[in-house]
């Protein structure tokens, strides 16, 4: 008979699963609908959201099931126990890829579009998921406790022949969880991300100081770089929340492993730690909505148009939700980009390819200066203005003009 504590745990987990599914589906929906959000950085954001959706759909139900200690074949129980590790690892790799993407955008913006393409990003995402399955399912290859259960130990649990009481620590060895999963596959990537974001902020600070000595036109480049820093801060917050949510559970595992004579952590401590780790799958959409204007406006449009059924539809892959909210008419929706053309329209009238957008539109933080551009002006941009705006965005490349400068745009 489940205890009151177990019932509360199950109810909280189900609520988290529902929020994780709905919130992260909203993120994927926003990227699909809003062309301003269809950039390389957000490919990794969608991969992260997909992992969080899988936590709600699969990992949390698995965690609830395994908490009951039901009787099952050892390797079946082991797969259920390991699946959440796959999703955790995928989240970590996505966060690391985002950090590296933002580092390239700020440190070497003029090479960003050449180095970071949509095709390469999709390849990196595929590799990340393959590695996540390989790391998370490593216990299935033999690093497990199933051989112990072949010696009759399962009989004390009241399970039949060939079955075990399915509990996480009974099938997954703690040395795997501490040395391999935590130290090698969680802590090391988190430290790498800490180093990458530290270098991002130091590089941005150095460039901003250099801009202070430039004449007035450098203010546009300063604003551009500040938007990149704002995007980096938003993503660094997501990394910090990931660490905050997952470290308590890993710390408990370390105590269990390094102090076997100590009493095992009680359920009143284990349940909150497990819930906190799963709650991490809920928080990211709120960070996007709070910190990133383009996501916030798109979420608002989706809720109004598709959920509340108010008549404000917008085209997938076309103009942005922000432009629709501002103008309300397909003929007037302009949401200009740095190339001087309306959102969703190339000079030849074709739809744009997402991977060719300037790196400055990572996460959809659109420059207010470009948003105020005249709707009727669909001609070529003012090359001199672009040159001044981008002057000083990178210490390695002062004084670039025209098309070259456009590739290095640093708006975020």
From Swiss-Prot:
It is found in: Cell membrane. One of its GO terms (molecular function) is lipid binding. Keywords: Cell membrane, Disulfide bond, G-protein coupled receptor, Glycoprotein, Membrane, Receptor, Transducer, Transmembrane, Transmembrane helix, Ubl conjugation. Residues 1-7, 67-77, 144-173, 259-266 are extracellular. InterPro entries: Adeno_A2A_rcpt, Adenosn_rcpt, GPCR_Rhodpsn, GPCR_Rhodpsn_7TM. Its main location: membrane. Residues 33-42, 101-120, 199-234, 291-412 are cytoplasmic. GO terms for cellular component: plasma membrane; postsynapse. Interacts (via cytoplasmic C-terminal domain) with USP4; the interaction is direct. May interact with DRD4. Interacts with NECAB2. Interacts (via cytoplasmic C-terminal domain) with GAS2L2; interaction enhances receptor-mediated adenylyl cyclase activity. This is Adenosine receptor A2a. It comes from Equus caballus (Horse).
């Amino acid at each position: 008979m489940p205890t009151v504590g177990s019932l509360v745990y199950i109810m909280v987990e189900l609520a988290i699963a529902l929020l994780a599914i709905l919130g992260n589906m909203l993120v994927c929906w926003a990227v699909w609908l809003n062309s301003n959000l269809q950039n390389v950085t957000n490919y990794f954001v969608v991969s992260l959201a997909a992992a969080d959706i899988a936590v709600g759909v699969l990992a949390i139900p698995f965690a609830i099931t395994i908490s009951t200690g039901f009787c099952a074949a050892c390797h079946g129980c082991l797969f259920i126990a390991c699946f959440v590790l796959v999703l955790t690892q995928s989240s970590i790799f996505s966060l690391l890829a985002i950090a590296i993407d933002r580092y390239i955008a700020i440190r070497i913006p003029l090479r960003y579009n050449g180095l970071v393409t949509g095709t390469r990003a999709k390849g990196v995402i595929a590799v990340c998921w393959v590695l996540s399955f390989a790391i998370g399912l490593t216990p299935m290859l033999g690093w497990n406790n199933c051989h112990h259960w072949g010696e009759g130990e399962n009989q004390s649990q009241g399970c039949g022949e060939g079955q075990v009481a399915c509990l996480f620590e009974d099938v997954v060895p703690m040395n795997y969880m501490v040395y391999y999963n935590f130290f090698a596959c969680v802590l090391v990537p988190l430290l790498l991300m800490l180093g990458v974001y530290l270098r991002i902020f130091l590089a941005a600070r150095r460039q901003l100081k250099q801009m202070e000595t430039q004449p007035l036109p450098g203010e546009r480049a300063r604003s551009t770089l500040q938007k990149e820093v704002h995007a980096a801060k938003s993503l660094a917050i997501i990394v910090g929340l990931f660490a905050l949510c997952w470290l308590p559970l890993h710390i408990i595992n370390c105590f269990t492993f390094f102090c076997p004579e100590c009493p095992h952590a009680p359920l009143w401590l284990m349940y909150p730690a497990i819930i906190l780790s799963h709650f991490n799958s809920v928080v990211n959409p709120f960070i996007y909505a709070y910190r990133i204007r383009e996501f916030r406006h798109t979420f608002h449009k989706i809720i109004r148009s598709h959920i509340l059924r108010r008549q404000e539809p917008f085209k997938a892959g076309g103009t942005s939700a922000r432009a629709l909210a501002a103008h309300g008419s397909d003929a007037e929706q302009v949401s200009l980009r740095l190339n001087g053309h309306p959102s969703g329209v190339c000079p030849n009238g074709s739809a744009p390819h997402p991977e060719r957008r300037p790196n400055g539109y990572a996460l959809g933080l659109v420059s207010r200066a470009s948003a105020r551009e005249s709707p009727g002006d669909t001609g070529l941009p003012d090359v001199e203005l672009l040159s001044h705006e981008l002057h000083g965005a990178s210490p390695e490349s002062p004084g670039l003009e025209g098309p070259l400068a456009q590739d290095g745009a640093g708006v975020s």
